[in-house]
């Protein structure tokens, strides 16, 4: 896996996971 792909995926997951945790 390329570092860019991993970083992008991790960042995207964090952005989606953060709001979800805040709502919960």
Curated annotation (Swiss-Prot):
One of its GO terms (cellular component) is extracellular region. Highly expressed in the kidney, heart muscle and testis. Not expressed in skeletal muscle. This is Humanin-like 8. Induction: Down-regulated 6 hours following staurosporine (STS) treatment and up-regulated 24 hours following STS treatment. Down-regulated 6 hours following beta-carotene treatment, returning to its basal level 24 hours following beta-carotene treatment. It is found in: Secreted; Cytoplasm. It comes from the Eukaryota. Keywords: Cytoplasm, Secreted. Plays a role as a neuroprotective and antiapoptotic factor. Belongs to the humanin family. GO terms for biological process: negative regulation of execution phase of apoptosis. The keyword Cell inner membrane does not apply. It holds the Pfam family Humanin. Its main location: secreted.
């Amino acid at each position: 896996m390329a570092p860019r792909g991993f970083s992008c995926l991790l960042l995207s997951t964090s952005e989606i996971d953060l709001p979800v945790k805040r709502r919960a």
